[in-house]
Curated annotation (Swiss-Prot):
This is Albumin. InterPro entries: ALB/AFP/VDB, Serum_albumin-like, Serum_albumin/AFP/Afamin, Serum_albumin_CS, Serum_albumin_N. Glycans are attached at residue 151. Belongs to the ALB/AFP/VDB family. The modification N6-succinyllysine is found at residues 228, 587. Binds water, Ca(2+), Na(+), K(+), fatty acids, hormones, bilirubin and drugs. Its main function is the regulation of the colloidal osmotic pressure of blood. Major zinc transporter in plasma, typically binds about 80% of all plasma zinc. Major calcium and magnesium transporter in plasma, binds approximately 45% of circulating calcium and magnesium in plasma. Potentially has more than two calcium-binding sites and might additionally bind calcium in a non-specific manner. The lineage of its organism: Eukaryota, Metazoa, Chordata, Craniata, Vertebrata. The keyword Glycoprotein applies. The modification Phosphoserine is found at residues 29, 82, 89, 296, 442, 512. It comes from Bos taurus (Bovine). Interacts with FCGRT; this interaction regulates ALB homeostasis. Interacts with TASOR. In plasma, occurs in a covalently-linked complex with chromophore-bound alpha-1-microglobulin; this interaction does not prevent fatty acid binding to ALB. Coiled coil: none annotated.
Amino acid sequence: MKWVTFISLLLLFSSAYSRGVFRRDTHKSEIAHRFKDLGEEHFKGLVLIAFSQYLQQCPFDEHVKLVNELTEFAKTCVADESHAGCEKSLHTLFGDELCKVASLRETYGDMADCCEKQEPERNECFLSHKDDSPDLPKLKPDPNTLCDEFKADEKKFWGKYLYEIARRHPYFYAPELLYYANKYNGVFQECCQAEDKGACLLPKIETMREKVLASSARQRLRCASIQKFGERALKAWSVARLSQKFPKAEFVEVTKLVTDLTKVHKECCHGDLLECADDRADLAKYICDNQDTISSKLKECCDKPLLEKSHCIAEVEKDAIPENLPPLTADFAEDKDVCKNYQEAKDAFLGSFLYEYSRRHPEYAVSVLLRLAKEYEATLEECCAKDDPHACYSTVFDKLKHLVDEPQNLIKQNCDQFEKLGEYGFQNALIVRYTRKVPQVSTPTLVEVSRSLGKVGTRCCTKPESERMPCTEDYLSLILNRLCVLHEKTPVSEKVTKCCTESLVNRRPCFSALTPDETYVPKAFDEKLFTFHADICTLPDTEKQIKKQTALVELLKHKPKATEEQLKTVMENFVAFVDKCCAADDKEACFAVEGPKLVVSTQTALA
């Protein structure tokens, strides 16, 4: 590598970026500036999302009042930027509105103490009270009721969707939620005209629900990366991802996009939703204006309206790898100046390694690419301190091979098991595996995480070999981040804390390497576990599965060393018990009589 040339390019880029893709002008009134940039509809939607993510228990109508107040104030500032209060920061304006809520202390307890602080501490305080698992009722779509609401007031319907999703997902990527709200309204526009509204609506809502949950999990991981491991972690992730998507783009261009994208995500994670959406729009414009040097796959995206354009760019397929790329070993193992180049600009050199590796390997997971970069960095730290560094680091690529082999072997083992057991059976196998590893974790969390992990089979094992690793590893990163977020709220296991906090990129290998916890003291047998009533018979299949899986976790917490045969016997007895009583004429009487018998047979089987 001509390192002097590279450093010159980097310095040139740094100078250019001081002007930036995003506008850096100062404005007399920030709220007026954002209102003019975003337009009234998007402004109101983003403000509604912001309030819903902070005040997750407030009724919709209360939020609408807050949104209308702030919107009217923004219009006043657009008309006259020197009007009293228009010069205040957005954090100050939002915080003042939150602190005016009469029921703040009664509904949110300690959160009300945030109002005694000054900015920026007040906003940090509000952020710390966001609840990743709020106690809110499940949303159960009733096609006829929803169509009536949609026809009565489309705007309110759109707002209600933003509110319901935002308060359940307090870190949802706000501009992306606007996109999904528009799509949601589009589904109702189509299906409420249909003869069979349910047949049209329900499959579309379910498909969309899966996409929304995945989008929420991706943003939660980004926010956790910044919160727990700093901006550098998110930048590294973005370098790998964008280098895979845009392999023809120069490293300096990728670095520029990464810096801007990190700023956008940092703003949204920090609750600065107006700035985040505005800057995301600017970034989409920049990418489209420069698509010739970024990717040949962008044209279709760039012809779309703003929200669809940004979504499309985020989801765009990977461009073809440029032809005749030199082997990686030339610059990163064979070159005798590797240590000199590394020590002169460590982050830039490692960034270029990650860029070059990622653009050549679209079939690798981002997390695997980051592990490779981390191991490469550790090798250079060790080798560059030796008398003959080149002899030490020249074989580094042989040492990195195991980091690719390990996930490939694990994926094969798990996909083989999935094909043998099916999704539900695979989930149960994971419940057994993870309950034995971390039995201190709450039963609902173990069930939720194991069910999600089990879906990786359906999602990824049917894909071609070239797509299996990114699908599996990156999906597992999202699920394990959910476990880490929930565990942080009520930490109960040192093993989980260690895996969650030591290294972001090594979380999955850390959890995979956990062994059954031999120090765990089993729970006493709880007869209430087998106290059921007739209402179980009318539950949807998914909820019935969750009931059975909850029982399985509790059995393992009582008898962690139960054999596969014992567990199989108990679960078969349990299923037979439910089936028998649900077929009985007097279901409630059957559950009352057969329940105690099941307790006895379970205790006998586990003895």
